[in-house]
From Swiss-Prot:
This is Phosphoribosylformylglycinamidine cyclo-ligase. Its EC number is 6.3.3.1. Pathway: Purine metabolism; IMP biosynthesis via de novo pathway; 5-amino-1-(5-phospho-D-ribosyl)imidazole from N(2)-formyl-N(1)-(5-phospho-D-ribosyl)glycinamide: step 2/2. NCBIfam families: purM (TIGR00878). It comes from Prochlorococcus marinus subsp. pastoris (strain CCMP1986 / NIES-2087 / MED4). PANTHER family: TRIFUNCTIONAL PURINE BIOSYNTHETIC PROTEIN ADENOSINE-3, TRIFUNCTIONAL PURINE BIOSYNTHETIC PROTEIN ADENOSINE-3-RELATED. GO terms for biological process: 'de novo' IMP biosynthetic process; adenine biosynthetic process.
Length: 347
């Protein structure tokens, strides 16, 4: 028995690398010294304008959204998701992304599917001036089924230590600005899949009620917020804290960008929760607490700012065609009786 008979096709792997080369290299900046094909990617660190350069790294995956995406052939979109989940995390520090690496594991290398994934990754990296420096595609027969793949991403950026955004300058009554999500993003899908499993006509119910395709809405790719954050910072507007709203929703993620002395006060009347979330809540009979702790509810990213910058930031967001609004404000913890946002689950 040879390796191919056991389920690993080395030749197909080589051909796959050759086919993705053009897409990957389209993301390269002049700082890439050696990328795809070598044992290690080489990247020249751009230090211009940085007094105390700091590298910022993040890693993430797409979670069980992949299960539905693979069934419905949303392969390009999950490539975008992979970059977004990593990049949105590192930019909360004020970092600019430099390079990205990916890991793909599959039971059998289905070339057309994975080419779409890589094209989605490359598209997002080009859009945000981030080079794909390397990656790994592992064919693992018997460990994964033939029609399944899993993804992991790794993003590295750079910031100036003196300008790091770490929440230390947050004060009472600072404003919380919400940036709209592009639907579900990449969290809560284990619950969603269970709801679908228990309601086999759910897509038809949704389409009849809202005249929208259920899976098109459900599997929209995660929005990447780097461009808008970078534009705000380039206008000498101080952002005191940022939060990427992922697993755990607003209650878990928003407090992470501020010290334990403060608590976020959220005005739940400041926005209308998108219909997809409300529909899932009703069909799945999701308890209120789980609803808030599972989904982003239309809020993909948050900024903590001094109120004097409010109008400038809202105008910049509008120019980027991103809906934004004042979600709430920061309170001292001992003054949290005013809280209108599920106070029993705020940290």
């Amino acid at each position: 028995m040879d390796y191919k008979t056991s389920g690993v096709d080395i030749k197909a792997g080589r051909e796959f690398v050759s086919e993705i080369k053009q897409s990957v290299e389209s993301t390269y900046s002049s700082n890439v010294l050696e990328g795809i094909g070598g044992f290690g990617g080489l990247f020249k660190i751009p230090l211009e304008g940085l007094k105390k350069p700091v590298l910022v790294s993040g890693t993430d995956g797409v979670g069980t959204k992949l299960e539905l995406a693979q069934i419905k052939n949303f392969h390009f979109e999950v490539g975008i998701d992979l970059v977004a989940m990593c990049m949105n995390d590192i930019i909360t520090t004020g970092a600019k992304p430099l390079f990205f690496l990916d890991y793909i594991a599959t039971g059998k290398l289905e070339k057309n599917q994975l080419l779409e994934v890589i094209n989605g990754i490359a598209h997002s990296c080009r859009e945000n001036k981030c080079s794909i420096l390397g990656g790994e595609t592992a064919e693992m027969p018997g460990f994964y089924s033939k029609n399944k793949y899993d993804l992991a991403g790794f993003c590295v950026g750079i910031a100036d230590e003196e300008k790091l955004i770490n929440g230390k300058k947050i004060c009472e009554n600072d404003l919380i600005i919400a940036l709209q999500s592009n639907g579900m993003h990449s969290n809560g899908f284990s619950l969603v899949r269970k709801i679908i499993e228990n309601n086999n006509q759910i897509d038809k119910q949704f389409e009849k009620k809202y005249n929208l395709d259920f899976y098109d809405e459900l599997l929209k790719p995660t929005k990447i917020y780097f461009k808008i954050v970078n534009q705000i910072l380039s206008q000498n507007i101080q952002i005191k804290g940022m939060s990427h709203i992922t697993g755990g929703g607003i209650p878990e993620n928003l407090p992470r960008c501020m010290s334990s002395d403060f608590i976020p006060y959220i005005d739940k009347k400041s926005w209308k929760i998108p219909v997809l979330f409300e529909f899932l809540k009703d069909v799945g009979q999701i308890p209120e607490k789980d609803f808030w702790n599972t989904f982003n509810l239309g809020v993909g990213f948050c900024l903590i700012i001094d109120k004097k910058y409010k109008d400038k930031i809202l105008n910049i967001c509008n120019a980027f065609d991103i809906s934004s609004w004042v979600l709430g404000k920061v309170l001292k913890k001992n003054n949290s009786k005013e809280n209108n946002f599920l106070p029993e689950i705020i940290i």
